[in-house]
Amino acid sequence: MKIRLVQYRDIIDCMRFDGSYHNADVNVYDSVIRKHSQHQLSHFCSEIFSTGRNKRTYTTPDFGYPYLSNSDVIAADPFMSCKYCSRKYDFDDKAVLREGMILTGRVGAIGQTSLVPSYFEKAKAMGSDNIIRIVIKPEYRKGFIYAYLSSKIGRLSFWKYATGGVQPFITETMVGLLPIPQFSQAFQKEIDNLIQKSITLRENAFNKLKETQNLILSELSVNISKRNFGKVSISDILQSHNSRFEANFHISEGADIERYL
């Protein structure tokens, strides 16, 4: 059984025993962080925002910009699994994920954070309306702040401010209330340098992954984008029952590629 002590001065502040005295790790961490914190997250940010929800027209990668969800932004190859929004009708400059932004989930993926690499912005990748963007002021170390927010204590802090029963959510204002611990400048610089190196390694890993994918396709002598996958031949239709389109004629590019391989 886990127990913890509650100081009398904490009770005097609110003049009652309330629900916040339940024995949760986040309460212990929060009390420690607040003793070593001078500012909330909003103090270090020029902007904390999420974009509005608009009508979207999905298309193929050749005619669209990447549209990333919370799960896509942390994937090794986000452009492989994401959807693509029409370049002609759906481009939203405000939704583009800029290099150095800290991302966190607004609904569902609360506490899941990531730091935007440069290739997101180069691809004009847009983030969904369920992603909260945290823009750190230039004079502060975004690598250090990201490292704290992505730590166990940081993730629990998000959930302390989250609300909602059936579908938990957190707002931009709530995110701005998170306390950020105060450390020495030397320690912050050390953490920031390590995070910057990790971002460089991630970008290099992404580039190498694309190179290996292209080598495999080249070795197989197949250009997926140029082949007529997803087509149904006339002979298949004529041989079907009553010479009609059957349910199994649905376009499955993956199945066609598998048969080709």
Residue locations for each model-derived region?
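A short beta-sheet element
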Residues: 95, 99, 103-147
